[in-house]
Amino acid sequence: MRLLILILLSVLVLFQYNFWFGSNGFLDYRQNAEKIKENQAENEKLSQRNQRINAEIQGLTKGFEAIEERARMQHGLVKENEVFYHIVKESK
């Protein structure tokens, strides 16, 4: 009888070890779950960035105002009979 109990206890310990530390065990599961959360957050950020870029592309392809605004801001272009003032803050 003692031998049977010892064998069953050994099997239980083996199963517990595999559950906690074995491949695809609980610790692997927790690590993978954390990686999945990180990847989902990164995917959400990239999806939002893609939406902003897509909206900008749509604005540039369909709207002259967006092209004009971009030319004014990035390249300092002005219209005819228009004066451009660039105010620079003094550095202390």
Swiss-Prot record:
InterPro entries attached to this UniProt entry: Cell_div_FtsB, FtsL/DivIC
Compartments reported by the entry: Cell inner membrane
Keywords: Cell cycle, Cell division, Cell inner membrane, Cell membrane, Coiled coil, Membrane, Transmembrane, Transmembrane helix
Coiled-coil segments: 28-63
GO biological process, one term: FtsZ-dependent cytokinesis
A GO CC term attached to the entry: cell division site
Domain of life: Bacteria
Transmembrane region(s): 4-21
Membrane topology label: Single-pass type II membrane protein
Function: Essential cell division protein. May link together the upstream cell division proteins, which are predominantly cytoplasmic, with the downstream cell division proteins, which are predominantly periplasmic.
Family, similarity comment: Belongs to the FtsB family.
Descriptive protein name: Cell division protein FtsB
UniProt organism field: Haemophilus influenzae (strain ATCC 51907 / DSM 11121 / KW20 / Rd)
Gene coding for it: ftsB
